[in-house]
Swiss-Prot record:
Residue numbers carrying N6-acetyllysine: 107
SMC hinge domain boundaries: 522-636
Any coiled-coil regions, as ranges: 202-503, 672-777, 806-888, 952-1007
Biased composition (Basic and acidic residues): 1060-1070
Full protein name: Structural maintenance of chromosomes protein 3
Length: 1437
């Protein structure tokens, strides 16, 4: 066994070791690495898994073990080691397994695979594999070598005791002493209890005799009681017959009264139907009357409004006509004034033109005169010039100036001419605008007139639609009222059906309707009652009786659909439903007789349905015939043996029974459902009609909205046109004003142009005169002719100017007059005339006349409607009076029928209660009779009533009273006297045996303590001898030529080297006074010629080497599967390192070594080198070659302190002087455990065989009796319990046996003569200890029981022992001695478990078959499971 892989995650410096493809070598593995890389943490992880590392139990201690780097700490971690278990050193049936220890702040657990283990399980597993807690030197830590080197002699002795297992012996001794003390205490208690039980047994013996007398009296009492019950049963039977006859009378009477009540009920129902119908009609007429009255009020209001509107239009017409006359008068007056002004203007125009012509002539003349005058004046003024040249120059300059003026005038004239043309065009444009405005105004007036006519037509249409909307509203309101009534009737019928049906069915149907509405599940046809119609209504009661709850069975297409619905109902835990899947239901054709008359027909013929539901209908109604009367039904039933039913619901069953009677029609589910169906159809039809009416109303409202929208549009257009007319009038006024203004401007510009042309011409004439003068001779004086001309011209000029002033004044007056008249014509008369014309056009008296006519027409129509409404109102009042007169006799009839039905119903209720009372009495007497007959039958085998027939009931009661008085005197008898007597006797015998066992076990324990002391001394001596021998041999191997030995020291040995050498002890002899030794000394010599010296005289390296030699000696004496060595060569020099390395390499043939080092010697001898590296915050163990490991060491060897000359152990050295490793010194403990496990297994086997024999015997004796079956069942239960315990003990034995063999034990066969007799005392001691442990719990349980509460029962109580026999029971007979001798010889033999297991299985199978025949097999499993805990608790001892 060795370590193959190591996986570490989250442990100290190891973040995640991960998987390495190279396994650890089963020999010598050497680990190197830098300081702080994680070598020691690797060993700590292995120790953590093996349980050697001391870790606290709190979370803080485990937190210290978790990997932490860079401030990040892992939450969990684990250490896992894969072990090679090919030698099966571990008690696991695997050649390889992995053990993991997972830890964190909140958990710490071991596991192998998926199986979790406790720390104790892991510790036991390692101890079984040879990791003894008494020899912890398979892990050598840093500093442990130094501790061994500096250890005192007394400490070495303690270490040797620990290795030898002395501590185990001490623990066993303490346990044995505790058991002895407990046994003595229990023995005293048992003696006291025995005295009490002996006294109690004597009392119970007397009570047993009283109990026998009591039981005899009880038996007589039961016999008389059974006889009295027999007599009472006969009396009950007679009473039942009388009650049945009385019930039959009431039943006949009730049937007659029921039919009578049914007849009255039908009449009452018809009268109530008529009454309700009349009430409904009255209510309807009353509602209609209210609506007609409201309609009359509406028409009156409408008529009043129309009259008011008509008066308004009349007033409006009168005002419009008055205004029109006034406007026309003003228009005529203004038109005359306008014509007069126009005539005056026409008169003024010629005069004005003539004066303007005269003015122009005078201007021409004056201009010519002025020009001539100017020439003469110039000529006259020539005296100022000295010469012609000067004169000509002056004239030339003046001509130039005048030419410039002429040019300017011509430009101005040209501009004026252009302005005049523009003014003329503008004037034309304004004229066109005026004409267009006038035309547009006329067109808009026509449009307004047309719009008004269209609006009037639309309003008429709107009024008609409003009337239709009003009537439709009335119809809808009436339909809604009827719809509410229908819905109330529908819901009332549904509530009535719910009260009749049971609640689960009602809830189921409600949920079914919801499922159908959701539509997620297809194929639901609905309840059967929905799927047919009743052809003959009088057969409703018959269908109700035959259908029953089957009426509400749900018809579906397949059973899968039914399963889906049921799943929903079960999930929601609501309702119950039954289903008829059409794919499953099949019916046989009924054997009906040939029907030759109309008195009988199949019930299925009175309904109609879809052919797909034929099978479903046949399933419910197909087996019954409906008959006209009872006689026919009885005749058909007898002749054809089929079920028949009458229309009254009386059923004549084919087997002879007849059921029927009164059925309240209010409680008939089918009738209620038909009512639901009727009102639902009425509701749906009315709902459809209401929807159509509402749709019609929506269309009318849409039309009304459209017309109103059109009216608003037309009115908006008219208002817009009227608004535009106002704007047009303003625009027209503006056009007229602008036109007048442009005319005036044109006239002014023409005048200015004319004047400007005259000035231009004058200037030109002046220039021509200057040119003429230039051409004339220079003369400074005028001629006489010229002077006269000058005088004449001067006078003419004055006259002309005077004339011009006069004419200009006249022109201005006429022009002003003309302008005034023109302005008055255009601004006043024209504008006002246009306004008057617009106002006249805006006035529309024809429209008012039309409105008056329309309103009158509407008033006439309203009058017609009012007359019709009043006639209808009178008709409704008359109808109400007629209905009131008609309903009164019906009300009287209803009251009388109610009184009669109430009387009959009360009588029927009384008869029903009487029949219920009779039925209850019959049932009560039936129960009494049946119970008494059952009691008589159950006791008929025990009692013989022949002897008691001489007694009647009274005499029997008298005898029973006498027996009861006798029993009263014995009422305090102890009913459990027999059981208690047997129980106390058994307890007495058991306690005697227990007391004897305690005496025997105390003696055995004392012998065991003595034996353990001897064993301990032998173990210490044997261990010391082996360690001393191996120490000497190891030291010689490490130091050739050297010698060393271990010596035992006593108190008188002062020197460290003094003491006894184990070689001086005889073989197998334990030195006397071993416990007087005080320590173990060491004497060593490091070569020939060297004196032996003690540890105190050695150097540090030598002490280390001696300590290593001692460790190797311990390892050879008690080897472990592998060893962990942490830098054990740290204090050695090169030669010693080489010696230690070679020795480890030799030991690694059989044992795995994992060592850390800083030197090259271990590296050279290693089978596999490993290097610990620290990278990225975590340590990792990686395989390396020898060169890689040496490079790491050389990097650390800064001072070249190591010697690298050693090349490893040679093959010759490796094979020379192979060390022989010893066997663990605790072999005898393994043998002890083996014997104890074997003893337990044999004891369990014996108990199981005994129980098996009892069970087999009971199987053979079993009969059909229930008691024998129960006994066999009980025996089988006990055997299964003991069989399971045996299997557990056998498995435990096999595990211990394997370990025993692994430690060198030999399994002997039965009857082996070589069995040592010396083992018998120890075996007996072991047996007594086991008995003591098994009986301790039994004794404590026995002491807790109270004697009076014992319920133990035995078939035959054992014979009680007398106190004088107590001492004889302690001794053992010769037969018992031989039996124990035989058992002792079998203790080390093997157990053949195949044969008993096979036999046990056969017995169990046979018993199971027996029990299965009696129906008891099913209960065994639960009972067996209840006993599992008891078995497991028994197996844990």
């Amino acid at each position: 066994m060795f370590i193959k892989f190591i996986f570490i995650k989250g442990f100290r410096s190891y973040k995640d070791q991960g998987f390495t493809s190279i396994t650890l070598h089963p020999g010598f593995n050497v680990v190197t690495g830098r300081n702080g890389a994680g070598k020691s943490n690797l060993f700590a992880a292995i120790r953590f898994l093996l349980g050697d590392l001391n870790v606290g139990n709190n979370s803080e201690d485990r937190l210290k073990l978790l990997h932490s780097y860079g401030g990040n700490t892992m939450q969990t971690g684990y250490v896992e080691i894969v072990f090679d278990n090919s030698d099966h050193r571990f008690p696991i049936d695997k050649t390889e397994f992995s053990l993991r220890r997972t830890f964190g702040t909140s958990k710490d657990e071991f596991s192998i695979g998926n199986n979790k283990l406790s720390k104790a399980d892991v510790r036991n597993m390692f101890e079984a594999a040879g990791f003894s807690s008494s020899n912890p030197y398979y892990i050598v830590q840093q500093g442990k070598i130094n501790t061994l080197a500096l250890m005192k002699d007394s400490d070495r002795l303690d270490m040797l005791k620990e290795v030898a297992g002395a501590t185990v012996y001490e623990e066993r001794k303490r346990e044995s002493v505790a058991i002895m003390i407990e046994s003595e205490s229990k023995s005293i208690k048992i003696e006291e209890f025995l005295k009490y039980i002996d006294e109690r047994i004597k009392v119970l013996d007397k009570e047993r005799k009283e109990l026998q007398l009591y039981q005899t009296q009880i038996e007589m009492k039961k016999q008389f009681e059974a006889y009295i019950i027999h007599l009472e049963a006969n009396e009950s039977n007679d009473r039942i017959l009388d009650l049945e006859k009385e019930k039959e009378k009431y039943l006949i009477h009730s049937s007659k009264e029921s039919k009578k009540l049914e007849r009255f009920t039908d009449e009452l129902k018809k009268d109530e139907s008529k009454f309700n119908k009349l009430l409904s009609e009255i209510k309807k007429i009353d509602n209609e009357k209210i609506m007609v009255e409201k309609l009359n009020e509406v028409f009156d209001k409408q008529k009043a409004q129309l009259v008011i509107q008509q008066k308004h239009f009349k007033k409006l017409l009168s005002k419009e006509q008055a205004k029109l006359e006034k406007l026309q008068k003003e228009q005529d007056l203004l038109s005359g004034s306008k014509e007069k002004l126009e005539k005056e203007i026409e008169i003024i125009k010629p005069k004005l033109e003539e004066l303007i012509g005269q003015e122009d002539d005078i201007d021409n003349k004056l201009s010519s005169t002025e020009r001539n005058l100017q020439e003469l004046y110039v000529k006259q003024g020539m005296f100022q010039f000295k010469s012609k040249t000067e004169r000509d120059k002056y004239l030339g300059d003046e001509s130039s100036k005048l030419e410039d003026i002429v040019n300017q005038y011509e430009q101005q004239a040209q501009s004026l001419e252009e302005d005049v043309e523009d003014m003329k065009q503008i004037q034309q444009s304004k004229g066109k605008q005026f004409d267009n405005s006038m035309a547009s105004k006329d067109k808009e007036a026509e449009i307004v007139k047309t719009a008004e006519l269209r609006v009037h037509e639309l309003k008429l249409e709107k009024d008609q639609i409003e009337q239709r909307v009003s009537s439709t509203f009335q119809s809808i309101n009436e339909m809604k009222s009827n719809l509410t009534e229908h819905r109330n009737e529908w819901k009332k019928a549904e509530r009535n059906l719910q009260t009749i049906m049971n609640r689960p069915l009602s809830e189921g149907l409600t949920r079914l309707n919801q499922i159908r509405q959701e539509g997620k599940i297809k194929g639901i046809h609905g309840p059967l009652v929905e799927l047919f119609d009743i052809v003959e209504p009088e057969a409703t009661l018959a269908l109700e009786v035959v259908g029953g709850n089957g009426l509400f069975h749900v018809v579906v297409d397949t059973d899968d659909t039914a399963s889906k619905i049921l799943e929903i109902l079960n999930t929601e835990n609501i309702g119950r439903l039954s289903f008829i899947p059409l794919n499953r239901v099949r019916t046989k054709p009924p054997k009906f007789p040939i029907l030759e008359n109309d008195l009988v027909c199949p019930l299925i013929k009175v309904i109609s349905f879809d052919p797909i539901y034929t099978e479903a209908m046949k399933l419910v109604f197909g087996k019954t015939l409906i008959c006209k009367d009872e006689a026919t039904a009885e005749q058909v039933r007898k002749s054809s043996h089929v079920d028949c039913i009458t229309f009254e619901g009386d059923v004549f069953h084919s087997k002879g029974a007849v059921t029927g009677g009164y059925y309240s029609k209010k409680k008939l589910k089918l009738s209620s459902y038909q009512q639901i169906k009727h009102w639902r159809q009425q509701y749906q039809q009315l709902q459809t009609q209401l929807t159509e009416k509402e749709s019609e109303l929506e269309k009318l409202q849409a039309s009304l909205l459209s017309i109103q929208k059109t009216i608003r549009t037309k009115e908006d257009e008219k208002n817009k046109i009227l608004s535009n007319n106002d704007n047009s009038r303003v625009e027209l006024d503006k056009i007229i004003s602008e036109r007048t203004m442009y005319i005036e401007i044109l006239e002014k510009k023409q005048t200015i142009l004319k004047k400007l042309k005259i000035d231009i011409q004058n200037c030109k004439d002046t220039i021509d005169g200057y040119q003429k003068q230039i051409n004339t001779a220079f003369n400074t004086k005028l001629t006489e002719e010229e002077s006269n001309l000058l005088l004449t011209l001067s006078e003419s000029s004055i006259q002309l100017k005077e004339q011009k002033i006069s004419i200009s004044s006249d022109v201005m007056k006429l022009q002003s007059r003309k302008n005034q008249m023109t302005n008055q014509l255009n601004q006043n008369y024209g504008k006002r005339l246009m306004e008057i014309e617009g106002e006249i056009k805006s006035l529309n008296p024809e429209n008012s006349k039309l409105q008056i006519e329309l309103k009158q027409k509407e008033i006439d129509e309203i009058n017609i409607e009012i007359d019709g409404v009043r006639e209808k109102l009178e008709s409704l009042v008359q109808s109400l009076n007629e209905k009131d007169a008609e309903i009164k006799p019906i009300k009287v009839s209803i009251d009388a029928l109610k009184q009669q039905t109430s009387t009959i119903a009360d009588q029927l209720v009384a008869d029903g209660k009487k029949m219920e009372s009779l039925l209850a009495q019959i049932q009560s007497f039936n129960k009494v009779r049946d119970a008494k007959q059952l009691r008589v039958l159950s006791k008929g085998d025990r009692f013989n009533f022949e002897e008691l027939k001489k007694y009647n009931k009274d005499q029997s009661v008298e005898e029973l009273n006498k027996i009861n008085k006798s029993l009263a005197s014995l009422r305090h008898v102890n009913q459990k006297a027999n059981d208690q007597f047997n129980s106390f006797t058994n307890q007495y015998n058991s306690l005697e045996a227990r007391r004897d066992e305690l005496y025997e076990s105390n003696a055995s324990i004392q012998l065991l303590i003595k034996t353990l002391d001897n064993k301990k001394d032998e173990a210490i001596a044997r261990t010391f001898s082996g360690v001393a021998k191996n120490f000497t041999q190891v030291f010689k191997e490490l130091i050739p030529g050297g010698s060393a030995k271990l010596v035992m020291k006593r108190q008188m040995d002062e020197d460290e080297g003094e003491g006894e050498d184990p070689k001086e002890w005889a073989d197998g002899e334990t030195p006397k006074g071993l416990l007087t030794f005080t320590g173990i000394g060491i004497q060593v010599s490091f070569g020939e010629g060297h004196e032996p010296c003690s540890m105190r005289q050695l150097s540090g390296g030598q002490k280390t080497l001696v300590a290593l030699a001692l460790i190797f000696a311990l390892q050879r004496t008690d080897p472990a599967p592998f060893y962990l060595l942490d830098e054990i060569d740290a204090a050695l020099d090169h030669n010693y390192r080489v010696a230690v390395s070679k020795m480890i390499r030799k030991h690694s043939r059989e044992i795995q070594f994992i060592a850390t080092t800083f030197g090259p010697e271990f590296v050279m001898d290693a089978n596999q080198n490993w290097i610990v590296v620290f990278n990225k915050g975590g340590s990792k163990l990686v395989p390396g070659s020898t060169e890689d490991a040496l490079n790491v060491i050389k990097q650390l060897d800064n001072g070249s302190a190591f010697d690298y000359s050693y090349q490893g152990i040679t093959e010759e050295e490796f094979n020379q002087d192979r060390p022989v490793l010893g066997v663990a010194e605790n072999k005898h403990l393994v043998a002890f455990e083996f014997k104890r496990a074997k003893k337990r297994a044999l004891k369990a086997l014996a108990k199981a065989e005994e129980a098996c024999a009892i069970m087999v015997q009971d199987e053979a004796n079993q009969d059909s009796n229930a008691d024998s079956s129960e006994k066999l069942k009980h025996d089988k239960k006990i055997f299964e319990k003991l069989h399971k315990e045996y299997l557990l003990r056998a498995a435990e034995f096999n595990q211990v046996k394997e370990r025993f063999i692994r430690f060198g034990g030999i399994i002997k066969q039965q009857g082996d003569d070589e069995l040592s007799q010396s083992s018998q005392p120890q075996d007996k001691e072991m047996e007594n200890i086991e008995k003591e442990k098994d009986n301790n719990q039994q004794t404590s349980d026995t002491e807790m029981k109270d004697t009076d509460q014992s319920t133990t029962k035995q078939k035959s109580p054992p014979k009680r022992k007398s106190p004088s026999q107590d001492t004889s029971d302690i001794e053992t007979s010769d037969d018992e001695s031989k039996k124990k001798q035989t058992e002792s010889n079998q203790e080390e033999s093997d157990i053949d478990e195949e044969t008993p297991s096979q036999r046990f299985e056969e017995a169990l199978n046979y018993a199971s078959q027996k029990l299965k025949q009696h129906g008891l097999q099913e209960s065994e499993q639960s009972e067996q499971e209840e006993d599992d805990d008891d078995i497991s608790s028994d197996s844990s001892d």
